[in-house]
From Swiss-Prot:
Annotated GO CC locations: helical viral capsid; host cell cytoplasm; viral nucleocapsid
Family as reported in the entry's similarity comment: Belongs to the tenuiviruses nucleocapsid protein family.
Signal peptide positions on this chain: none
One Gene Ontology molecular-function label: RNA binding
InterPro entries: Capsid_Phlebovir/Tenuivir, Nucleocapsid_Tenuivirus
Name of the protein in question: Nucleoprotein
Sites where the protein binds RNA: Y43, Y46, V76, R122, K240, S269
Main location: virion
Described function: Encapsidates the genome, protecting it from nucleases. The encapsidated genomic RNA is termed the nucleocapsid (NC), and serves as template for viral transcription and replication.
Pfam family, one: Tenui_N
Length: 322
């Protein structure tokens, strides 16, 4: 044990006070250095360029085919399929090709401590346009939490995990969206979906380890990760806009958002957001202008909330702006 250990309670309290005083003085004098350090260590998601480099190095002439097959694996069987392939369980036809892909690219079932690990989920998000076509054209795709689970009936196409790649936030800080943009609709939907799916699928041990056993902590965690994803520059603004319009196409007529999306959002408010505690709803209300409406009116009827959402969109300039 070090010789600097305080001998008495009074010594301990004095040491804490002295170090705190010195640390606060340092922060005051060197705030710029601390801010720079914070920016350097802040989690910013995986390095897409690193992943692309690995994929191109290992893929060669079959890269396009391989990515299509990997993304198909992700949406037909889920990210846990990698474990099945590795253990040679629950896999019949197609097992040889699946095993080859997992081995070739070093695909793992979860990120773990490797910030740039290659998972099926990351591949799907890295190539959102491919993912969009896979879920549209291939039967048997599934998600752990669908739109009916959120009271957002009929909106499954909005919930796929690649969709946040298309979202463009309006602000660097909360509230992240304030206008009636298509991004705003998708952002609100994914705040709730990312929370619900993580709460359902994350093992209890990991929740305790990360301090996520309370809804408010889980909501802050999942929203934080969503914001990081939305800020991704992997796609150009033009490609993001094209993606948003593809995803929301069925909810837009003549450049205007259909009332069906208003009703769906209202359903999410009264059926799902209403089940959250006050602290969680207060946090949600701070994230965007539309979410504020949904989080603060959960005691109203779905028809009333739908009317409020409709008013929000009509108060803005006409049209489904992007």
């Amino acid at each position: 044990m070090g010789t600097n250990k305080p001998a008495t309670l009074a010594d301990l309290q004095k040491a804490i006070n002295d170090i705190s005083k010195d640390a606060l003085s340092y922060l005051t004098a060197h705030k710029a250095d601390v801010v720079t350090f914070a920016g350097q260590i802040e989690y910013a998601g995986y390095d897409a360029a690193t992943l692309i480099g690995i994929l191109k190095d290992k893929g060669g002439d079959t890269l396009a085919k391989d990515m299509t097959m990997c993304i198909t694996m992700r949406y037909v069987r889920g990210t846990g399929f990698v474990r099945d392939v590795t253990k040679k369980v629950k896999v019949a036809a197609g097992s040889t090709e699946a095993s080859t892909l997992v081995s070739r690219y070093g695909i793992v079932s979860s990120v773990g401590t490797n910030a740039n690990a290659i998972t099926l989920g990351r591949l799907a998000q890295l190539f959102p346009n491919v993912s969009h076509e896979v879920v549209r054209q291939i039967s048997g795709v599934k998600m752990a939490v669908d739109s009916s689970d959120l009271g957002l009936t009929g909106c499954d196409n909005l919930l796929w995990d690649y969709v946040p790649q298309y979202i463009k936030l309006e602000s660097e800080t909360a509230p992240y969206c304030s206008t009636h943009s298509l991004s705003h609709i998708l952002f609100v939907v994914h705040i709730i979906h990312s929370f619900q799916i993580t709460k359902k699928t994350m093992p209890e041990g990991k929740k305790k380890e990360r301090g996520l056993t309370k809804d408010i902590d889980m909501m802050k965690y999942t929203t934080g990760l969503l914001v990081i994803t939305c800020k991704s520059k992997n796609l150009s603004d033009k490609k993001k806009e094209e993606g948003r319009k593809k995803v929301l196409d069925e909810f837009i007529t003549n450049g205007k958002v259909k009332t069906t999306i208003f009703d769906a959002l209202a359903g999410m408010s009264v059926n799902t957001i209403s089940t959250y505690g006050n602290q969680t709803r207060l946090y949600l209300a701070q994230q965007s202008k539309l979410m504020k409406i949904l989080a603060e009116n959960t005691s109203k009827t779905a028809t009333e909330v739908s009317g409020l959402v409709k008013e929000f969109f009509e108060d803005e300039a006409e049209g489904a702006d992007d």
